[in-house]
Amino acid sequence: MAVQQNKKSPSKRDMHRAHDFLTAPATAVEATTGEAHLRHHISPNGYYRGRKVVKTNND
């Protein structure tokens, strides 16, 4: 089993963890309906980049 040769200081430990935070997903707003959706995904009502690409139940 690997054993560290020297103890990692709290400063070095925290610098190592500096990028472990969570980021919010990137969202976009559909131009025609104003609905928010994930980037590069269709909106819940079937629009993508201003065009209807999927038929939904309320059509």
Swiss-Prot record:
Cystine pairings recorded for this chain: none
Biological process terms in GO annotation: translation
Domain of life: Bacteria
Keyword Ribonucleoprotein: yes
Pfam families: Ribosomal_L32p (PF01783)
GO cellular component, one term: large ribosomal subunit
UniProt KW keywords: Ribonucleoprotein, Ribosomal protein
Transmembrane segments: none
Identification of the protein by name: Large ribosomal subunit protein bL32
Organism: Polynucleobacter necessarius subsp. necessarius (strain STIR1)
Primary gene name: rpmF
